[in-house]
Amino acid sequence: MIFLKKAAIISGVFISGLIGAGFATGSEIYFYFSRFGMWGIAGVFLAVLIFAFMQYAVLNQAHINKTFTIDEYLKKILKKPLCNLVSAFSYMFMIFILSAMMSGFGEMMYEMYGIKKLFGAVLMLVCTIIIVKKGYNGFVSTQSILSVAIVLIIGGVCFYILSFGNNQIEVFNPQFSWAGSAVCYTGYNMLTAVAVLCILAKDTQKKTSVFSALITFVILVFLMAVMWYIIFKFDGIINLGSMPILRICMYNSNNLAIIYSLAVFFSMLTTAVSSAYALSVKY
């Protein structure tokens, strides 16, 4: 059963890189899925299906071709001019994500606790550097452990929230633009995720790739579906702002918001670490 343990670890590292500030706060769910009403849940399933398929495909191909960096991987599937362009864009996006997580955490610390934004940004940077300097084993173990904490906190808080509030869900905007929104959501997230999957491919094989993709599918469907439902329970009842789930927690109690802010912090950290580690492999 060792392959199942490896599959779970790989899935954890992959998920920890996907679940950033936008996911944990619910802003991505709100923007990419909630505005399509009941059709939004179809978008959730489509997005997660794409994530799981891409995870399997990249892991399997990278392992077969022994392409353990995004540069090596892209050289196998793209011609040189396009390969260089996509590679450069991916690394630029990683730098952007790293910067966004730092500034985002600084903003959250200021909004929730009145702490200076610079302090929050520096704290995020220091934590990221410490984890990256631990090397591959430190990166994998830290990301997989934090992914468990993220899933448990988000899942636990969301189930608690389900016990109060409005249960009405409106059906509106029933058109196939929900599919385009789902594809767009997965597309920009995979820019950095591919780099991490290539790094993880050295520890995988076909069976591991399949099971890790299945684990990812189950976990992401659960998290995204319950968050989508909760947003609909409270949309129109309170001002959801740019951090819907966190706002809903604050609506219930400050203690719940503090607990959930841990998940947001861990999510920002793991996303920042994923980008930083992929960049460290490059440079």
Language-model region placement:
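Juxtamembrane transmembrane-helix boundary signature
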Residues: F45-D71, I230, F234
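Small-residue-rich segments of transmembrane alpha-helices in multi-pass membrane proteins
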Residues: I19, G40-V44, K75-S87, L146-L162, ...
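Hydrophobic transmembrane alpha-helices that form the core helical bundles
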Residues: A57-Y113, S261-Y283
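Membrane-interface interhelical connector segments
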Residues: F232-N254
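Membrane-water interface regions at transmembrane-helix termini and the short interhelical loops
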Residues: Q61, A100-M112, L125-L146, K202-Q205
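Hydrophobic, membrane-embedded alpha-helices of multi-pass small-molecule transporters
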Residues: K5-A24, F93-M94, L98, I161-G165, ...
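Extracellular loop-to-transmembrane helix junctions
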Residues: K5-A7, Y32-A57, V210-A225
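Transmembrane alpha-helical segments of multi-pass small-molecule transport proteins
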Residues: A7-G17, A42-F53, N84-I95, E111-G135, ...
